[in-house]
């Protein structure tokens, strides 16, 4: 079982219900901002540190995986450690989303917004009230000009429960009943695949898109280090933030 805690958040569960019940209409766009000043890390970048939970929630809300992933960002404090990234996910039926994460931001913000054809929903995990619906609509003047019709937001009541407690209760139920958990290994693998694809495009933006040294029969990611005296088999690939010690044999 994977610890994607937001899937156990009462507001996220209620948001999923709103989408499933058609309260927002057809989902057109979804995006999240996870921003703060710190905690700055040196062993992993902001994408791998902040984005996994948002990716997990998007997959859960849309019930599908993206057909295309791209990402770009900036590294300002440490070489090869991105401090901010913007990742774009493209799904079927023209649904798109983005995930903006940043640990060099002046204030804390944790929002996920779903834009539908009938209404828009905001999950704000920093606010006292967690879930809002904005029933804004678009009307067409003379069938040609789109006019926004604004409406007051509505606070959606959600159960007051700790997501971590909910997650642990779900884990206990899984152990007792041996039923498939909501965030199982397969769900974790889907998130990991998207993170990997996003990380690959980050390198592409830098002008160094995971180029393999053709003089070698194996590939070592630029964030990894291989000691002298290591044997690496042909076709092997060593990925992010690995340290291969002297005397090791791989492949």
Where are these regions (language model features)?
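A structural motif detector for beta-strand N-caps
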Residues: 217-220, 224, 230, 235-242, ...
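A short glycine-threonine-serine/GTX helix/turn-capping micro-motif
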Residues: 43-48, 154-162
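Mid-domain beta-loop-alpha active-site segment that forms a flexible
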Residues: 3-10, 35-68, 82-83, 167, ...
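C-terminal helix-rich "cap/oligomerization" subdomain common to oxidoreductases
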Residues: 92, 170-215
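Short, intrinsically disordered, charge-balanced linker/junction segments flanking boundaries
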Residues: 23-24, 247-251
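A contiguous active-site-proximal alpha/beta segment in oxidoreductase catalytic domains
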Residues: 1-39
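Contiguous beta-strand/loop segments that form the cofactor/metal-binding neighborhood of enzyme cores
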Residues: 52-135, 158-161, 165-179, 196-198
């Amino acid at each position: 079982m994977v610890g994607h805690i937001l899937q156990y958040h009462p507001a996220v569960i209620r948001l999923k219900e709103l989408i499933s019940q058609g309260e927002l209409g057809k989902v057109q766009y979804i995006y999240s901002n996870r921003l703060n000043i710190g905690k700055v890390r040196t062993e992993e970048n902001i994408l791998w540190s902040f984005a996994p939970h948002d990716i997990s929630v998007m997959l859960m809300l849309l019930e599908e995986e993206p057909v295309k992933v791209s990402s770009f960002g900036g590294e300002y404090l440490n070489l090869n450690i991105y401090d901010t990234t913007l990742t774009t996910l493209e799904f079927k039926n023209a649904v798109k989303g983005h995930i903006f994460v940043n640990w060099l931001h002046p204030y804390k913000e944790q929002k996920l917004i779903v834009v539908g054809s009938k209404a828009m929903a905001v999950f704000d995990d920093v606010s006292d009230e967690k879930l809002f619906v904005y029933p804004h609509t678009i009307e067409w003047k003379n069938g040609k000009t789109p006019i926004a019709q604004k409406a007051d937001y509505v606070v959606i009541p959600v159960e007051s429960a700790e997501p971590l407690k909910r997650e642990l209760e779900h884990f206990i139920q899984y152990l007792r009943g041996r039923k498939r958990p909501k965030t199982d290994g397969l769900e974790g693998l889907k998130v990991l695949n998207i993170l990997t694809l996003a990380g690959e495009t980050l390198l592409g933006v830098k002008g160094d898109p995971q180029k393999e040294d053709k003089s070698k029969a194996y590939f070592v990611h630029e964030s990894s280090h291989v000691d002298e005296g290591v044997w690496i088999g042909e076709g092997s690939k060593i990925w992010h933030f690995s340290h291969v010690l002297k005397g090791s044999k791989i492949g």
